[in-house]
């Protein structure tokens, strides 16, 4: 990054640790180590990691026009479907004074998530099935924000069950259309999902194409 580049801070997001420079998104980090081969750069004497939109859906949503990113620096975040830690590492960056609980059911990606947590003191991995929030609720004091990225047919019900258990104020849901039903029209599946989520205060629905086909990122207040 040249010294002449001036970062354009994303519009009125609550969290100032996210910046966008032209078609790239970055998170300010206290842990300047690559997690998945991303670029690390210095801007105004601060260290940033590039947030790859082809590897992480919130970055894709930002580039596709997401206006509100409701995660604050001291929030407690419950992340369902944490996988190997690509996206949750950026959530860890933007919540340096917060706590991030990452739930992952598969052992192989969980082992990588566990390695990541050894380098980040605000990240707590949980090896459990998000279908059963009662199995890990004892570990979690409170939740401000819930983020879900799970490829299961009942992904909406998983989201609602965890909202009922943890009562977060705000939520992100990655809707994976083809995981719900592979043969039905995408618009029909999206409309059904919107009906199921109408009990919440829906804020934004962002199509993630071309970064992810038949994927949407939905933000809401509960």
Swiss-Prot record:
Asked if the Swiss-Prot or TrEMBL record annotates the protein with the keyword rRNA processing, the reply is yes
Q: Name one Pfam family in it.
A: Fibrillarin
Q: What is its EC number?
A: 2.1.1.-
| InterPro entries, A to Z | Fibrillarin (IPR000692), SAM-dependent_MTases_sf (IPR029063)
Q: One MF term in GO for this entry? A: RNA binding
Keywords on record: Methyltransferase, RNA-binding, rRNA processing, Transferase, tRNA processing
* Gene Ontology biological process: box C/D sno(s)RNA 3'-end processing; tRNA processing
Q: Does the keyword RNA-binding apply?
A: yes
Q: Which domain of life is it from?
A: Archaea
- Residue positions annotated to bind S-adenosyl-L-methionine are 86-87, 104-105, 129-130, 149-152
The family assignment reads:
Belongs to the methyltransferase superfamily. Fibrillarin family.
Q: What does this protein do?
A: Involved in pre-rRNA and tRNA processing. Utilizes the methyl donor S-adenosyl-L-methionine to catalyze the site-specific 2'-hydroxyl methylation of ribose moieties in rRNA and tRNA. Site specificity is provided by a guide RNA that base pairs with the substrate. Methylation occurs at a characteristic distance from the sequence involved in base pairing with the guide RNA.
Question: What assembly does the database describe for this protein?
Answer: Interacts with nop5. Component of box C/D small ribonucleoprotein (sRNP) particles that contain rpl7ae, FlpA and nop5, plus a guide RNA.
The name this protein goes by in its record: Fibrillarin-like rRNA/tRNA 2'-O-methyltransferase
Q: Which organism is it from?
A: Thermoplasma volcanium (strain ATCC 51530 / DSM 4299 / JCM 9571 / NBRC 15438 / GSS1)
UniProt gene name: flpA
């Amino acid at each position: 990054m040249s010294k002449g580049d001036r970062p354009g801070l994303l519009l009125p997001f609550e969290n100032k640790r996210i910046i966008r420079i032209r078609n790239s998104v970055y998170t300010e980090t206290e842990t300047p180590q690559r997690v998945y081969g991303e670029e690390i750069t210095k801007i105004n004497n601060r260290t940033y990691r590039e947030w790859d939109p082809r590897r992480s859906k919130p970055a894709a949503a930002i580039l596709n026009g997401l206006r509100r990113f409701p995660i604050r620096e001291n929030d407690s975040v419950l992340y369902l479907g944490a996988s190997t830690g690509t996206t949750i590492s950026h959530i860890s960056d933007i919540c340096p004074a917060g706590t991030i609980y990452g739930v992952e059911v598969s052992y192989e990606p969980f082992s990588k998530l566990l390695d990541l947590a050894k380098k980040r003191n605000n990240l707590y991995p949980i090896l459990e099935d998000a279908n059963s929030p009662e199995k890990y609720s004892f570990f979690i004091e409170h939740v401000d924000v819930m983020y879900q990225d799970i490829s299961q047919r009942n992904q909406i019900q998983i989201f609602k069950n965890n909202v009922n258990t943890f009562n977060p104020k705000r939520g992100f849901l990655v809707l994976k259309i083809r995981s719900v039903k592979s043969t039905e029209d995408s618009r029909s599946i999206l409309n059904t999902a919107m009906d199921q989520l109408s009990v919440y205060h829906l804020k934004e629905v962002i199509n993630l194409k071309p970064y992810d086909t038949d994927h949407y990122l939905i933000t809401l207040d509960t």
